[in-house]
């Protein structure tokens, strides 16, 4: 299904120039086109979802960017525990590291693989909410590795996210003026949207 994301502009590379009035068209897992909104709307149309040759329209008060790359992905997901909201009274809501994490491991509940997996899923949600579109591993804990794979976030050794190009992966973030991620799209899937 085609989706036309109408935004205030597109920044195809991190810290690159902003193309005001540009938009992106997503076709499955790929970026079908990047260009001025009016041209894309004329070429792809907008209308009811599923209508032949017509794109669904999503409008955002932000700009499309490649998103952010998390170089410390392994440390954030394997050396920190992201508490369940039901644990907030006892553990707080911020990730636990160092001695607090060691003490948690010594507790009666301990840190079995299932708990690491749940922690990683919550950590990944935090990353997606921040507009993260790639991260660096390697991930040695099986439950964490599984959570990362299921999230769809690409594991990359590089210094940053890939530039946005027509025909390239539909992986990007939409950010507000203050840098807040409004939405994160990974391989064409809207995986996070700020309410």
Name each region found by the language model:
Residues 1-51, 160-180, 185-195:
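N-terminal metal-binding scaffold of metallo-dependent hydrolase/deaminase domains
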Residues 3, 54-55, 128-137, 172:
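Hydrophobic beta-strand segments of well-ordered beta-sheets in folded domains
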Residues 4, 28, 103-107, 118:
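Non-catalytic sensory/regulatory segments that transmit input signals in bacterial signaling proteins
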Residues 53-58, 154-156, 184:
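Conserved beta-strand scaffold positions in the cores of enzyme catalytic domains, especially
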Residues 106-130:
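Alpha-helix-centered segments that form part of catalytic cores
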Residues 119, 123, 140-144, 160, ...:
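General structural feature for long, well-ordered alpha-helical segments within catalytic domains
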Residues 133-161:
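Active-site loop-helix segments enriched in His/Asp/Glu that coordinate
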């Amino acid at each position: 299904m085609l989706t036309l994301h109408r935004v205030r502009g597109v920044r195809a590379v991190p810290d690159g120039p902003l193309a005001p009035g540009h938009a992106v068209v997503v076709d499955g897992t790929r970026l079908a086109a990047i260009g001025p909104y009016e041209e894309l709307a004329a070429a792809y149309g907008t209308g009811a979802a599923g209508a032949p040759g017509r794109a669904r329209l999503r409008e955002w008060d932000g700009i499309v960017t490649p998103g952010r790359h998390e170089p410390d992905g392994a440390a954030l997901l394997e050396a920190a525990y992201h508490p369940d909201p039901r644990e907030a009274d006892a553990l707080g809501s911020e990730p636990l590291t160092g001695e607090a994490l060691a003490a948690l491991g010594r507790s009666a509940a301990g840190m079995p693989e299932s708990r690491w997996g749940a922690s990683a899923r919550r950590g990944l949600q935090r990353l997606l909410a921040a507009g993260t579109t790639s991260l660096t591993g390697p991930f040695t804990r099986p439950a964490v590795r599984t959570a990362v794979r299921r999230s769809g976030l690409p594991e990359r050794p590089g210094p940053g996210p890939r530039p946005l190009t027509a025909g390239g992966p539909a992986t990007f973030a939409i950010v507000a003026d203050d840098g807040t991620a409004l939405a994160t799209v990974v391989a064409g899937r809207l995986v996070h949207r700020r309410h």
